[in-house]
Amino acid sequence: MRIIEIWFDDEHIYGKDESGQEYRQSLLWYPKLRLASDEERANYTFGLGGIHWRELDEDISFESFEYDDAEPSAMQRFFLTHKEINVAEFARSIGMNASLLRNYINGFKKPSAEREQEILSHIHSMGQEMINVTF
């Protein structure tokens, strides 16, 4: 599959392949593109295996448009939109390997339902602690 045309909206990059099939991916997977101006987004080149934005130092493979996880899960979306949370410290606080949590966040591995619930419960616990802060 080869993407021959791309376009954007505020939250997605869209691609059309040679057969006319359209695809989309969340820009949360590509923070540099998400924050880029229209002019920066328009300055790309097609390569043999993907799309390259030299000024942004960003690449998207053609293959990635066919991935099942074009949209981040709720857990992934939380961590991708809250960069202020230190993933290594969050993982340590629940006794999880930080690399494993990063793999969950970036879509390289999928957590079990139980593990995802454990992560969610800890996020809720942190939120409750923050709500209870007084000065």
Region annotations inferred by a language model:
Residues 1-135:
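Motif-centric detector for short Cys/His coordination patterns
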